[in-house]
């Protein structure tokens, strides 16, 4: 068995992994994407896919879509942490079914 060089625990040792799609509505302003991505990278969560688009110019809102993989506990933690970020208005989490 090869030991991982990662500072973070490897998900395969933690439990069953599921792929989730997060849709996050945020203020369309400088630095918001960095805060959202920083939440993932700072805790060692991998972003498999990322897309950002302005959705409402009048209300100055953008939608960030992130695909990630994690255990149910990790996904719940990500959801709670995203909801605490100041520029975040709404978080939707969808489990991807194969």
Label each region the model flagged.
Residues 1-98:
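A conserved regulatory-domain signal marking ACT and ACT-like small-molecule sensing domains
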């Amino acid at each position: 068995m090869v030991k991982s060089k990662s500072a973070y625990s490897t998900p395969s040792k933690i439990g069953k992994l599921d792929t989730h799609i997060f849709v996050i509505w945020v203020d369309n302003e400088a630095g918001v994407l960095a805060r959202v991505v920083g939440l993932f990278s700072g805790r060692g969560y991998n972003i498999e896919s990322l897309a950002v688009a302005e959705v409402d110019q009048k209300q100055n809102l953008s939608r960030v879509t992130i695909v990630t993989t994690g255990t149910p506990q990790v996904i719940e933690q990500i959801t709670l942490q995203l909801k605490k970020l100041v520029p975040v208005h709404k978080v939707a989490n969808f489990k991807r079914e194969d």
